[in-house]
């Protein structure tokens, strides 16, 4: 979609399993003012501060997806309203949620903190672009976990902030048009 100008997709033969793997690579010639940096330079994954004795909502994945009513806990790791949580355990590792209210972070999450010089929605689009790869490369056998090493190593093309704003606007516009098309099918 909008990332076509800075990404190209190639198929590579996986010599070990005879499968074709999708690889997203960067063009070597980026526009002036752009740079490619690892994800770990743009954001961090943390746990909230431990609190005990205060009744607050449990912000677990089922609640955040609207699949379950609100439950409360009297202890946990604090998350402010409008924080970003990234799913690090389970089938959908790499999925990001914005908390509608303050509460305790679910046990399958880490808080996602994005650097101030990065447009939040720009980085969320980049993370979403890599969700398939993150899901397919989980670690752990009983409960699959987000491969944090892979996540931190994702190479992100970073344009100047005003370009990030334009890219986000273009992506949102394209998604709105696609939604309109889907509604009219």
Predicted segments, located by residue:
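A short beta-sheet element
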Residues: 65-67, 75-128
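Short helix-capping and inter-helix turn/linker motifs at the boundaries of alpha-helical repeat units
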Residues: 15-18, 99, 142-146
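Non-catalytic DNA-recognition/assembly elements of restriction-modification systems
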Residues: 1-5, 9-50, 55-64, 153-185
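Interdomain signal-transducing alpha-helices
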Residues: 123, 131, 164-167
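Short, solvent-exposed loop/turn positions at domain surfaces
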Residues: 30, 72-73, 140
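Short amphipathic alpha-helical signal-transduction/dimerization elements
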Residues: 127-135, 175
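A short glycine-rich beta-alpha junction/loop motif
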Residues: 103-110, 140-162
């Amino acid at each position: 979609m909008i990332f076509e100008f800075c990404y190209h997709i190639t198929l590579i033969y996986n010599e070990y399993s005879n499968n074709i793997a999708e690889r997203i690579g960067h063009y070597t010639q980026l526009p002036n003012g752009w740079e490619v940096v690892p994800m770990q330079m743009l954001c961090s994954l943390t746990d909230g501060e431990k609190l005990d004795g205060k009744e607050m909502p449990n912000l677990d994945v089922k609640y955040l997806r609207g699949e379950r009513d609100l439950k409360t806990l009297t202890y946990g790791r604090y998350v402010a309203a409008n924080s970003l949580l990234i799913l690090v355990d389970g089938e959908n590792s790499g999925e990001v949620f914005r908390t509608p209210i303050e509460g305790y972070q679910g046990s399958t999450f880490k808080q996602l903190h994005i650097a101030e010089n990065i447009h939040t929605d720009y980085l969320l689009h980049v993370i979403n672009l890599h969700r398939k790869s993150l899901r397919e490369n989980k670690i752990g056998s009983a409960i699959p976990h987000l491969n944090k090493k892979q996540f931190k190593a994702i190479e992100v093309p970073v344009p100047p902030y005003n370009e990030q704003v334009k890219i986000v606007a273009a992506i949102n516009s394209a998604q709105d048009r696609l939604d309109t098309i889907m509604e009219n099918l």
